[in-house]
Every structure is written in structure tokens, then in C-alpha cells.
Design a protein with these regions (language model features):
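Alpha-helical membrane segments of multi-pass proteins
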Residues: 1-174
Length: 174
């Protein structure tokens, strides 16, 4: 596992811990009305991200076009769908320390930029155009080569694929 991969794995583990802390609080306060299947979708999405970026599949992506395309499908289609299907907003917010939510998340969420971004986030056409744009961008030979030759740009590519997938699915997943 490379340095950047280790950082991503740590972020995924930390996010899972925050999610389950919040999920437990939400489950206690809502009388158990959160379906178990929904809570399982979140770690499954994170696991698929890990499989796409750190498993044998990741080591084969330079050699096999099939492995490369499976990575793209996992990062842009399957993992984001599962993460969003879990409805992670409340569990993640409740899992964070209260002081952090009050002093950082709250003020940031009330900014004009946050309101502007949330307005765009739900517009189907915008989400699809950005998602397609990200995919096209990374297949321009110059950027594709940079992602293959430099670990940092490969991480940026995968992160943008995941972000584009989350954006793509956000107006569609209830």
C-alpha cells in the first residue's frame, strides 16, 4: 500500500467510525426505525472504493483495460450509489463531535457559497453534465498519461471520479 493509499484507507476507516457513531445515536433516538440494510450500504460503498483503489484490481489497472474499466464503474457508479442510498447525512453529522459541528459545520453550511452549491447539487442536468465532463477530462491523453505516471494525479483522478459519481446519483437516489 502506497503512502496516498494509506491515507485514503485511514480516511475511509475514520469516516466509517463517524458514520456508525451517528447511526447508533440516530437509532437510539428514533426508536430503531432505521433499516439495517440502509446502514450496511454505507460501509459496502466504502469497501468498494477500497477494492477499486487498493486491491489486486488496482495493481492490474495499468495492464488490463478490463480492470481499468471495472475501477471506473466501481468509483463512478456502484460505490457512490450505495453511499447515497444509505442516506449518510444525519449519521455523519451526529457522529461528529458536537463542538466541531457547532463551530465549523454549522457556520460553513450557512454561507452563500454553501447555499449556491446545494442549489446546483439537486439539479439533474448540472449533475449529469459535470459527471460526463469529469469522465471526458480524464480521457484526454495528456491528463490520462499524467494519472498513469504520477501517483498524486492518479489519486486526483479517482477522487474526481468518486465525486462525479456522488454528484451524478445525488438527484436520483431518494
Amino acid at each position: 500500500m502506497t503512502g496516498l493509499s494509506s491515507i485514503l484507507a485511514s480516511l475511509s476507516l475514520g469516516t466509517s467510525i463517524v458514520y456508525f457513531r451517528g447511526w447508533q445515536k440516530l437509532r437510539v433516538h428514533s426508536g430503531g426505525s432505521i433499516p439495517l440494510w440502509r446502514s450496511i450500504c454505507f460501509p459496502c460503498g466504502l469497501l468498494l472504493i477500497w477494492l477499486a483503489t487498493n486491491s489486486t484490481l488496482a495493481r492490474l489497472d495499468d495492464e488490463l483495460l478490463t480492470a481499468h474499466m471495472v475501477q471506473h464503474l466501481l468509483l463512478m457508479s456502484v460505490a457512490p450509489f450505495l453511499i447515497l442510498w444509505s442516506r449518510p447525512k444525519m449519521p455523519l453529522l451526529l457522529g461528529l463531535p458536537v463542538g466541531f459541528v457547532r463551530s465549523v459545520v454549522g457556520p460553513l453550511s450557512r454561507t452563500r457559497l454553501a447555499h449556491f452549491i446545494s442549489g446546483l447539487w439537486g439539479r439533474l442536468a448540472f449533475c449529469w453534465i459535470v459527471s460526463i465532463g469529469v469522465l471526458i477530462f480524464w480521457h484526454v491523453p495528456f491528463f490520462f498519461t499524467a494519472a498513469l505516471n504520477f501517483e498524486f494525479w492518479h489519486l486526483v483522478e479517482h477522487s474526481s471520479f468518486l465525486a462525479a459519481g456522488l454528484l451524478f446519483w445525488s438527484p436520483l437516489v431518494p
